[in-house]
Amino acid sequence: MELSEIKRNIDKYNQDLTQIRGSLDLENKETNIQEYEEMMAEPNFWDNQTKAQDIIDKNNALKAIVNGYKTLQAEVDDMDATWDLLQEEFDGEMKEDLEQEVINFKAKVDEYELQLLLDGPHDANNAILELHPGAGGTESQDWANMLFRMYQRYCEKKGFKVKTVDYLPGDEAGIKSVTLLIKGHNAYGYLKAEKGVHRLVRISPFDSSGRRHTSFASCDVIPDFNNDEIEIEINPDDITVDTFRASGAGGQHINKTESAIRITHHPSGIVVNNQNERSQIKNREAAMKMLKSKLYQLKLEEQAREMAEIRGEQKEIGWGSQIRSYVFHPYSMVKDHRTNEETGKVDAVMDGDIGPFIESYLRQTMSHD
């Protein structure tokens, strides 16, 4: 890349950031941050823990936007200063470093713009992600477990914290189901792109004849709603609460008493399990919160369905069908059927590199809104 081209790219980035700044209202956001931090410094701040956590989350979200912009602008200013130095005295190694910075910077701007677009009413929330294997016994249970690992690795790379709240191992290998609580800013905003059916094609390690098998697993994702977001009353007569002994994933704490909780909500048919906490009381509280989140999501989807009917739209809400195929044999390819995004780097995808699929889907849905 010639120096003149490097300069054109730097100038373009400066223009992009100026345009982004115009839509951000940074001064107002910084004022809000100051107000939130004054609230957080008050001695009675933690009297209402739910309200306190809400303020902390809002403050962190604003700081992510403001600091994200300032970091990008500082990087562009540094690149500009380096270019000026190269004009005064050329240095081949410095030029190579600057060229690489210019190339890498585009991805950083794209990622930041995507964060700004995640402005849905619940995008900033934590996420509850569930995996269930399709028919096919051990083969599909192993596939669900592979997806479980894929999402764990993706979340690690994004800086999200993952808590396994329910885990049911498969008969021979894999899992029959798993429920994850994923904590982090915009966790739901990103992971909502994964809701649907995932298809695997491979030579089965469980088939002595070495035949090719197709397996399916479903992924469901809902926001983890804060208590003050949910206007749901649950009639005690509508639920059954059962206790059972926690099974636990490998290496996790396994209770010797029946501290795990299963709540069945009969009107909706929703069943939630929680075995992450060490006490039955805490597991029950966590399970009730999860049940409320599921019922509230159900209510929101019903409202969205009604609005779609009013507008005459045929937009499917809910699980939908197959969203992505992972082909290990006879060739290597992962393809998203909603966006046609694809890659031959199957191992990287299974190691959590699903960002391009998520971002492609989010940009497509945002452009259609």
From Swiss-Prot:
An example Gene Ontology molecular-function term: translation release factor activity, codon specific
Could you name the domain of life of the organism this protein comes from? Answer: Bacteria
* Major localization listed first in the record, in broad terms: cytoplasm
Location comes to:
Cytoplasm
Entry keyword set: Cytoplasm, Methylation, Protein biosynthesis
What GO CC annotations are associated with the protein?
A: cytoplasm
By sequence similarity, the record places it as follows: Belongs to the prokaryotic/mitochondrial release factor family.
What more the UniProt record tells us is: The gene for this protein contains a UGA in-frame termination codon after Leu-24; a naturally occurring frameshift enables complete translation of RF-2. This provides a mechanism for the protein to regulate its own production.
Q: What is this protein called?
A: Peptide chain release factor 2
Q: What is the lineage of its organism?
A: Bacteria, Bacillati, Bacillota, Bacilli, Bacillales
